């Protein structure tokens, strides 16, 4: 603001006169001498400062008087200078009457012990004592009042009219006292920013509050003499004269009223007080020497009182008598003001230096120095020093309140301490002080200081003054002050906008990359992914970005703005911009004017004054933020779209019902077209164009409820003209949907549903043909393919027959791919500019549009797991390059370690293996190192382009086996076969049903040794499985196809169990060393819970049934022998296998039993017809009381059972259905311990199958201790002294020798029913007798025993709880079991007899001890030598010493 004022004065032509007047005033002031001289000489000597800062100066409140002062100064500048006096010649010229402005950077701390340290008020007095004044930086807020002006004191003496609190304008003008004409009316204020006087009453003309009667004139001069403190004149504050009859006195009354009634200007240049109007040669530097003599310059802190909330930060004022203001931190100097604020002052005579009013002209609260206090002799130093001490204490206490400044920090240096005060010395009155004596009154308490404010550092302070209320809603967007935006002017020739407002850089028009990018920008129909100003006018880019934001699904535009898809030319150009544009101009956080590469510089929008152009910048800023998630960003985007809708669609804003009427008219147009249809043969191209138009409308409508109406016409009644009209109406309807109301959107949804149901027979109920006709996506998939197959796919896209030309008047078949109607040849497509297929402008919206139909269905069903046709039922875009994160090996390259069985794949299938991406579960395993494309040179694409042999075509068909469904699919082709009628499970999507693989391709894919021959037809029922086969080989494919080896012949399958394993649970895979282990989930059951239910045992984290403890694959041979097939949702051909079994057995009039345990049904899962038996249950690990209530010891072996969860109840339903369907077959036994065997680590070996039969146990254990004389080794090998059971399985030697190592204890099932299981909240809900029965029951391992199921009301009928009885000795009755770290001893209920040992009193459970660190409590065992143990189980046990080892 100071620079603007300086330029204004200089341009107005008054600055030369001011310099001349200041020089003349300086010479006359020196000639008058320090002793005073005549009154006229003092006035002439002070006119140089009064011209700027005096009561009638240019920066005072009296603008009219300022004009008179200018004229008087110009007239007096021609007088010859008066020679200096003798006294003045003796003093140095430098320290005589000098006023120095001290900048922030020139501050220094006072020396320790200096009296002036931290006392700006003291420094002020010293400066006035020696006849000079130094102005320091202003403070935040001042507490001192504003002293009266000389004119006010003169008016008080003369009794000027106007009543109390008012003064005459003429009396307040120093120009009028010297003969210059003064204003006779209310003074006008001059605004430097506007340049015209403002007709506003000055501070003297405003009403004041009534003041007390005037006091004697002798007291008015007391503050000027700065005498000792007295009760009437306290040293801590100034003395005021509240009733002076004229202008307010130096008290706080005038300052307070002036601050309350004065309206500040918005652009008031308070910073101009730091400017020096003298020539550079006439300025004197600042004296900061602390050891200078009495004639040296003394720095004085100068106060500026804050002017309201819009205070300028460069204001400067003179400290009043009330003490110095609080200190503030030095602020950083702005660019360009260092030379003007380097501590240079205004030279004048000693008397005029105090006489002139240096308070800011626009600071209403700034105190002014009274004339009587300024014009005093040098002998008043003793009295003023005491007053200065009082001011020093006040200023230091107030300075501590400022933030960021340490208490007591000095503002400026002061001279040496003054001499002791001389009370007898009286000040010599001057002419001015004698004539301006006024009455004095007791001084009021000083005003409290304002709280400190945080300093603003904005260089454009006028832009921060926001007006109240919203900006104008029409017209150009201007600043809050109604001005053009700063920095929006066009840059200089040869430069372009870059960086902050007004900044620029050199242009790069001559670069080849820039010229090519400009050509692509001119040819592009949408926004380009990288834009710089050299590419041309940014209006096209801004408008394209706005269209992009309002088109497509929510969030896609934001994603593209943040990370636009770039082709190779755009990527090279982006790298060029990073290297040549951004890198030379700063770091990553440097202000560039745009957030992302597609955005033009924001200065273009500011210059155009178009608020709509700010929308892409706001959306990009939100997209780049990391403080919001995707949903929150979508909300902000929708808010911006709604806020800018009136500007983006001005027609709708003018007429609120314009868009709604358009939607209604278009919907009526659709129905009218069907009503006026004429029969005729409809080309397939027109039907596909109608399908694409329907998709565009649905994309704008989603989410919107849809209904299925009846077709409007039969397919034979539709003609070409009808479809042309319907397609045109749909395309117009798509553009009219944004801004429509809910009712109109529902009407549009009904219309597009009517069109779809009517045209569906023409496209054979599939949209794949329409998607395949979008040749742009064929080119895009080819261009984004890997380098080794990109050329072949590009040639195939060029050879693909394109659609027919649309009829006249019909909209383009690909409305979102402008400029591409007929596929171009391969060379032209390879070098196509950005406006052609796959470029940045069309990528965001089109990617979402064309893949929206298949993304919701085929992606989850597994179609996305391959490349090309394997990822889509048609030739749609290939998502594999976007998701491919790991490198792939080259075609035909062999992975090390795959084994000889990899050779089972045909050569064609091997060549097509490496181009798809793998699922996460397929990439884990021991083989983790793979060859990649980067290890060798890429294959030459030229032979692929030139070759047209059948082998190349067959190779490509094997890589991309899926295509659209033909009119008559071959019976042995690969496609989904869903039975007609009702199904137990959801039907697959239309995209999954439309996928088709030709029979010869399907045979080539499935005829491999990896797949059993009898199960190969099941793979042809699943096109997704064929796509996976085309992209995989080796161990990953073999693991997923291992389910086929459970049952050799599909005819033998009776029951299919569907399950969804937990992560890292594998039924047919060996756990690899170092592979991640599954995590226990008490709320969700997986493979472990299912197998435990079949094995009639508990599944806890420490049991053998938990997959985390497996060291090998489990054995389910007993289940498979009964015709039970376990099929995982992750198995290869999961959906096709179920549908194949349903189809094959249904054709043989046999029903299949399907036991479904999957909680989250996969998308496009198998469809099970209602002809077969379907049982739906769930796996619930919390059904085990040990998991549900871990603290309940008495129910540790109990399991809650219901027909809705996997257990004996649901198994009974399956077994009953099996007995009814197969009456002559052996009954099912689904809950038996021998159904499943686990491979775990035991003392018999790291891979021990459990339960290990007793004979096998003895064969493994006894040879290791036969002949061994080390008793410790024998005890360790045989488990002597260990608990009989650990974690519910046989662990000790005697238990393993009887039931087998790892034989589990059987649980007790408690039947609760569906409702009872949900309502059971705690163990207290079960009867007490049931809990006691479960606590005492100990069911010994039995491979053939059926589950024991109890009901809460039938506990008494169950009899005594079952127990374990040792039959080899009468006193062996207790069983020791370890659970939860404690060893419990279980005794049967009737064990307390004659043979009972000491302490065996019949208690059911007794805790005898806690296992030690080695897991085995020490017992009183004597030395036992094992010589031989017979393995004959039928031998007589009596007298066998080896059975009595306990």
From Swiss-Prot:
It is found in: Host nucleus. It comes from the Viruses. Residues 101-112 have a biased composition (Acidic residues). Residues 25-59, 73-493, 801-987, 1385-1446 are annotated as: Disordered. Residues 73-94, 166-189, 216-241, 284-306, 345-397, 427-442, 827-877, 933-952 have a biased composition (Low complexity). One of its GO terms (cellular component) is host cell nucleus. GO terms for molecular function: DNA binding. Residues 262-277 have a biased composition (Basic and acidic residues). GO terms for biological process: DNA-templated viral transcription; positive regulation of DNA-templated transcription. InterPro entries: Herpes_ICP4_C, Herpes_ICP4_N. Residues 415-426, 803-815 have a biased composition (Pro residues). A long stretch of serine residues may be a major site of phosphorylation. Residues 883-892 have a biased composition (Basic residues). Keywords: DNA-binding, Early protein, Host nucleus, Phosphoprotein, Transcription, Transcription regulation. Belongs to the herpesviridae ICP4 family. This IE protein is a multifunctional protein capable of migrating to the nucleus, binding to DNA, trans-activating other viral genes, and autoregulating its own synthesis. This is Major viral transcription factor ICP4 homolog. It comes from Suid herpesvirus 1 (strain Kaplan).
């Amino acid at each position: 603001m100071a620079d603007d004022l300086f330029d204004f004065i200089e341009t107005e032509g008054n600055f030369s006169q001011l310099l001349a007047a200041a020089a003349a005033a300086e010479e006359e002031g020196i000639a008058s001498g320090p002793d005073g001289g005549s009154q006229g000489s003092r006035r002439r000597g002070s006119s140089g400062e009064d011209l700027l800062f005096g009561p009638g100066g240019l920066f005072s409140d009296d603008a009219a008087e300022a004009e008179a002062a200018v004229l008087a100064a110009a007239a007096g500048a021609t007088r010859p200078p008066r020679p200096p006096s003798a006294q003045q010649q003796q003093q140095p010229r430098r320290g005589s009457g000098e006023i120095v402005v001290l900048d922030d950077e020139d501050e220094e701390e006072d020396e320790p012990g200096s009296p002036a340290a931290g006392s700006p008020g003291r420094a002020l007095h010293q400066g006035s004592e020696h006849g000079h004044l130094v102005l320091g930086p202003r403070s935040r807020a001042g507490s001192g009042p504003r002293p009266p002006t000389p004119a006010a004191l003169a008016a008080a003496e003369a009794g000027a009219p106007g009543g109390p609190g008012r003064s005459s304008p003429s009396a307040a003008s120093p120009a009028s006292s010297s003969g210059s004409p003064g204003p006779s009316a209310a003074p006008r204020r001059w605004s430097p920013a506007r340049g015209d006087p403002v007709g506003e009453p000055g501070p003297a003309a405003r009403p004041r509050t009534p003041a007390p009667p005037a006091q004697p004139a002798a007291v008015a001069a007391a503050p000027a003499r700065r005498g000792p403190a007295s009760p009437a004149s306290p040293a801590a504050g100034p003395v005021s004269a509240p009733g002076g009859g004229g202008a307010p006195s130096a008290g706080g009354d005038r300052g307070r009223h002036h601050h309350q009634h004065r309206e500040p200007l918005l652009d008031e240049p308070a910073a101009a007080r730091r400017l020096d109007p003298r020539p550079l040669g006439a300025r004197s530097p600042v004296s900061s020497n602390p050891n200078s003599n009495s004639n040296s310059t003394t720095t004085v802190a100068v106060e500026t009182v804050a002017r309201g909330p819009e205070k300028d930060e460069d204001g400067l004022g003179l400290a009043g008598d009330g003490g110095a203001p609080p200190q503030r931190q030095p602020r950083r100097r702005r660019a360009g003001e260092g030379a003007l604020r380097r501590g240079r002052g205004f030279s004048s005579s000693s008397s005029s230096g105090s006489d002139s009013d240096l308070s800011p002209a626009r600071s209403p609260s700034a105190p002014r120095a009274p004339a009587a206090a300024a014009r005093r002799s040098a002998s008043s130093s003793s009295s003023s020093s005491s007053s200065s001490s009082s001011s020093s204490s006040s200023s230091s206490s107030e300075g501590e309140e400022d933030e960021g400044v340490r208490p007591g920090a000095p503002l400026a240096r002061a001279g040496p301490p003054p001499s002791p005060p001389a009370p007898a010395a009286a000040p010599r009155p001057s002419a001015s002080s004698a004539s301006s004596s006024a009455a004095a009154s007791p001084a009021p308490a000083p005003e409290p200081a304002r709280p400190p404010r945080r300093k603003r550092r904005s260089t454009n302070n006028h832009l921060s003054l926001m007006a109240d209320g919203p900006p104008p809603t029409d017209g150009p967007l201007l600043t809050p002050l109604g001005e053009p935006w700063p920095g929006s002017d066009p840059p200089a020739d040869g430069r372009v906008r870059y960086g902050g407002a007004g900044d620029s850089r050199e242009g790069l028009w001559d670069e080849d990359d820039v010229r090519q990018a400009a050509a692509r920008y001119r040819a592009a129909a949408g926004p380009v992914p990288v834009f710089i100003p050299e590419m041309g006018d940014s209006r096209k880019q801004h408008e394209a970005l706005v269209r992009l934001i309002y088109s497509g699904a929510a969030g896609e535009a934001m994603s593209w703005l943040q990370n636009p898809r770039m082709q190779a030319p755009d990527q090279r150009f982006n790298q060029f911009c990073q290297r040549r544009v951004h890198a030379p101009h700063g770091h990553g956080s440097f202000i560039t004017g745009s957030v992302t590469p597609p955005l033009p510089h924001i200065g273009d929008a500011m210059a155009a004054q178009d608020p709509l152009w700010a929308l892409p910048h706001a959306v990009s800023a939100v997209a780049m933020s990391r403080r919001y998630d995707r949903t929150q960003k979508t909300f902000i985007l929708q808010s911006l779209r709604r806020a800018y809708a009136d500007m983006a669609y001005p027609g709708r804003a003018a007429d609120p019902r314009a868009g709604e009427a358009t939607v209604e008219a278009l919907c009526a147009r659709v129905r009218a077209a069907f009503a006026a249809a004429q029969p005729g043969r409809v080309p397939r191209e027109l039907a596909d164009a109608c399908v694409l138009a329907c998709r565009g409308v649905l994309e704008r409508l989603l989410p919107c409820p849809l209904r299925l109406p009846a077709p409007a016409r039969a397919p034979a009644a539709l003609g070409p003209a009808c479809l042309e009209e319907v397609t045109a109406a749909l395309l117009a309807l798509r553009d009219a949907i944004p801004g429509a109301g809910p009712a109109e959107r529902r009407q549009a949804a009904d219309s597009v549903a009517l069109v779809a149901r009517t045209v569906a027979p023409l496209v054979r109920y599939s949209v794949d043909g329409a998607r395949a006709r979008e040749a742009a996506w064929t080119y895009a998939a080819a261009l984004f393919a890997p380098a080794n197959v990109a050329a072949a796919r590009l040639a195939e896209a060029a050879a693909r027959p394109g659609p027919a030309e649309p009829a006249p008047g019909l909209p383009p078949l690909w409305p979102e791919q402008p400029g591409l109607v007929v596929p171009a040849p391969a060379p032209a497509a390879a070098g196509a500019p950005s406006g052609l297929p796959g470029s940045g402008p069309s990528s965001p919206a089109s990617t979402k549009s064309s893949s929206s139909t298949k993304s919701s269905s085929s992606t989850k069903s597994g179609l996305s797991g391959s490349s090309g046709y394997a990822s889509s039922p048609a030739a749609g875009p290939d998502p594999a390059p976007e998701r491919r994160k790991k490198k792939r090996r080259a075609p035909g390259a062999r992975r090390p370690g795959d084994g000889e069985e990899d050779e089972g794949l045909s050569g064609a299938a091997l060549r097509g293996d490496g181009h798809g991406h793998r699922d996460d579960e397929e990439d884990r395993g021991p083989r983790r190192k793979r060859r990649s494309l980067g290890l060798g040179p890429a294959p030459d694409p030229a032979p692929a382009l030139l070759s047209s042999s059948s082998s190349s075509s067959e190779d490509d068909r094997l890589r991309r086996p899926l295509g659209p469904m033909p009119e008559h699919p071959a019976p042995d082709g690969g496609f989904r076969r869903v039975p007609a009628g009702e199904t137990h499970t959801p039907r697959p999507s239309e995209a999954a049903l439309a996928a088709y693989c030709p029979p010869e391709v399907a045979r080539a894919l499935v005829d491999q040794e990896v797949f059993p021959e009898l199960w190969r037809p099941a793979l042809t029922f699943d096109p997704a499985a064929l796509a996976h086969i085309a992209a995989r080989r080796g161990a990953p494919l073999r693991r997923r196809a291992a389910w086929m080896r459970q049952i050799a012949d599909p005819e033998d399958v009776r029951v299919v169990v569907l399950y969804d394993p937990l992560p890292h649970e594998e039924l047919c895979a060996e756990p690899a060393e170092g592979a991640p282990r599954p995590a226990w989930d008490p709320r969700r059951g997986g493979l472990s819970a299912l197998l435990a239910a079949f094995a009639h045992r508990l599944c806890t984290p420490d049991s053998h049934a938990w997959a985390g403890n497996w060291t090998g694959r489990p054995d389910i041979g007993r289940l498979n022998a009964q015709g039970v097939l376990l099929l995982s949702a992750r198995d290869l051909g999961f959906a096709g296998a179920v549908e194949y079994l349903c189809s094959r057995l249904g054709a043989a009039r046999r029903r299949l039993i399907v036991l479904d345990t999957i909680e989250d049904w996969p998308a496009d899962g198998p469809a099970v017809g209602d002809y077969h038996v379907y049982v739906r249950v769930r796996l619930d690990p919390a059904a085990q009381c040990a998991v549900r209530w871990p603290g309940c010891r008495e129910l540790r072996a109990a399991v809650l059972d219901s027909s809705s969860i996997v257990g004996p109840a649901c198994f009974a339903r399956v077994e009953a259905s099996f007995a009814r369907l197969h009456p002559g077959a052996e009954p099912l036994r689904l809950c038996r311990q021998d159904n499943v065997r686990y491979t775990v680590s035991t003392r018999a070996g790291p891979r021990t199958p459990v339960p290990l039969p007793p004979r096998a146990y003895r064969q493994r254990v006894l040879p290791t201790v036969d002949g061994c004389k080390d008793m410790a080794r024998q005890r360790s090998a045989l488990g002597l002294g260990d608990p009989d059971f650990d974690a519910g399985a046989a662990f000790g030697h005697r238990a393993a020798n009887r039931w087998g190592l790892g034989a589990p204890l059987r649980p007790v099932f408690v039947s609760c029913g569906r409702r009872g299981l949900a309502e059971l909240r705690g163990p207290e809900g079960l009867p007490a007798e049931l809990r006691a029965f479960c606590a005492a029951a100990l069911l010994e391992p039995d491979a053939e025993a059926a589950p024991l199921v109890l009901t809460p009301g039938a506990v008494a009928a169950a009899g005594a709880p079952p127990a374990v009885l040792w039959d080899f000795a009468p006193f062996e009755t207790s069983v020791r079991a370890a659970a939860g770290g404690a060893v419990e001893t279980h005794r049967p209920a009737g064990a307390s007899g004659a043979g009972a040992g000491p302490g065996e009193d019949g208690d059911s459970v007794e805790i005898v001890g806690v296992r030690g660190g080695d897991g085995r409590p020490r017992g009183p065992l004597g030395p036992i030598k094992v010589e031989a143990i017979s393995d004959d189980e039928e031998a007589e046990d009596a007298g066998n010493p080896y059975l009595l080892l306990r």
